[in-house]
Design a protein with these regions (language model features):
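Conserved PLP-enzyme active-site core in the AAT-like
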Residues: 2-288, 292-310, 319-330
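Nucleotide-binding motor/catalytic cores of P-loop/tubulin-like NTPases across gene-expression machines
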Residues: 315-316
Length: 330
């Protein structure tokens, strides 16, 4: 079986497992108050060029998303996201479950090539019209959510990130960036956004571990102290505090040593691009132009049968027409 349906079908980077084993009998404080979490937090802050970065370790991406959004949104507010944003399509209503609507905006006919990305001009138009109307019967936008890379493996540019941040500031909204697969964006040759940029042009972002070589875990980073009030309590309230917190610290301490977070993801991006080129050379088209570890070719049912017969697994992303599906290779 050749598994291409996700990027978390194996355990973790072998060195992390070795450190787990080596430190297994150590006794440390719980709840992320251990030396490993402290060291990892300091290394992440240095990598982001921001000494006062407030780092919190959670277990999973959906948990991180609804906990962060629950902490920054008021009861009458929702979060603006792309149509294919993870919080809108792949979290079983987790954000709605804590009382906040996902306000999904469409790129429409103008930029319909990819509904996983928010374009600055479309965001600005949506927010400007909403607040100009002043309709207090409607759910009010209280934050903007984006991911880098997006659900379709598409990258934001630094220019787009700066523009989105500027729009958020103009409307007095926090910008939250989901980095579930951030390492693959940072490892891509087509990426021009750095960790320092994320620390400068977002209010909150998280650094993915689960899908980026770790066994589990995400590092939520507050760059703006306006939004981290009582976050430890809110995380506990939402069931997000791991008693054996050092298991999170150990992983991120390793990932942020010797640039491992980026370097360990380069092969995944390299081979994904090789697969992309091989399929393109055979006349296969893609639903988006991805330069990360996720690729989205459009295959006929006959072509999918060939993959099935050769024990190659994949995810069906969407139906394109009566003869073709878009699949995800990851």
């Amino acid at each position: 079986m050749y598994r291409f349906e996700n990027d978390y079908s194996q355990g973790c980077i072998p060195e992390i497992l070795e450190i787990f084993t080596r430190t297994n009998m150590e006794q440390t404080s719980g709840y992320r108050l251990d030396p490993y979490c402290k060291a990892a937090s300091e290394k992440i802050a240095r990598a982001c060029g921001k000494d006062d970065l407030d780092v919190h370790f959670l277990v999973g991406g959906t948990q991180a998303n609804f906990t962060v959004l629950d902490s920054i949104l008021r009861p009458h507010q929702g979060v603006v996201a792309a149509q294919l944003g993870h919080v809108n399509v792949h979290e079983a209503g987790a954000v709605e479950g804590v009382g906040h609507k996902v306000l999904a905006i469409s790129n429409g006919d103008i930029k319909k090539d990819d509904e996983s990305k928010i374009y600055p001009d479309i965001l600005d138009d949506y927010l400007t019209k909403f607040f100009a109307k002043g309709d207090w019967h409607m759910v009010q936008p209280g934050a903007v959510y984006i991911s880098h890379p997006t659900e379709r493996g598409v990258l934001y540019t630094r220019e787009e990130l700066i523009a989105i941040k500027s729009i958020c500031e103009r409307h007095n909204l926090p910008l939250y960036l989901d980095g579930a697969r951030l390492s693959y964006a940072l490892a891509s040759e087509n990426n021009d956004i750095s960790l320092e940029d994320l620390a400068k042009y977002t209010d909150i972002f998280y650094i993915g571990g689960t899908k980026c070589g770790g066994m589990f875990g995400e590092a939520v980073c507050f760059t703006n102290s306006k939004y981290n009030l009582d976050f430890n309590c809110i995380t506990k309230h939402n069931g997000g505090v791991l008693a054996k917190g050092r298991l999170l610290g150990i992983q991120f301490d390793y990932l942020f040593t010797d640039n491992n977070y980026i370097e360990k993801s380069r092969n995944a991006v390299k081979y994904a691009i090789m697969i992309k080129k091989a399929l393109e050379d055979r006349g296969i088209s893609f639903i988006v132009d991805s330069y990360t570890n996720q690729q989205f070719p459009i295959l006929s049912y006959f072509q999918k049968e060939i993959l099935d017969k050769n024990n190659i697994t994949y995810n069906v992303e969407s139906n394109v027409d009566e003869n073709n599906d878009c699949i995800r290779l990851c």
